[in-house]
Amino acid sequence: MDVRPYLPADRDACLAVFDSNAPDFFKSHERRDFEGFLDRGAVPYFVMEHDGAIIGCGGYFVTEQKAVARLVWGMVRRDWRRQGLGRFLLLFRLRQITKAGGVEMVHLDTSPDSASFFQSQGFKLARVAKDGYAPGLDRVEMTMKLTVCP
């Protein structure tokens, strides 16, 4: 399993990963948001590859408060889920955030179906916004205090 920085040539493969998770984890209107995010390329974003095929992607950014990072657009292709790859990608991003230095708290938002995964990795529920993504799809906001062991 390799993880590397996203390149514009990865766009279609990342959109295919997104599409494999719709409509269960993403609603159709979110695809435009994801396309715009990929096209802007404004934050650290990574792709996970297996034998040259992109099977996952995810990124983060450090907020203006500097001590807070936010995980964004993390996903694993549907046919590769339930194999520990979501955890692998999450830990990779947390290591990148740690390397950036100065970050004390990590925030994310996710769907209710994925919230238990993040809770199992140490994230705490901050709040639930009913219909926050779309009618019938709540937005779950979660946080984790980032601790670095010497």
Region locations from a protein language model:
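A short beta-loop-alpha structural element at the N-terminal edge
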Residues: M1-C14
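Residue-level recognition of the GNAT/N-acetyltransferase active site
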Residues: L7, T63, R77, S111
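Active-site rim helix/loop that mediates acceptor-substrate recognition in acyltransferases
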Residues: D24-H50
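Short, high-confidence coil segments that cap the C-terminus of an alpha-helix
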Residues: V43, G102-M105
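Conserved beta-strand in the GNAT
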Residues: V47, A53-V62, V68-M75
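Conserved catalytic-core motifs of GNAT/GCN5-like acyltransferases
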Residues: M105-D109, Q119, K124-E141
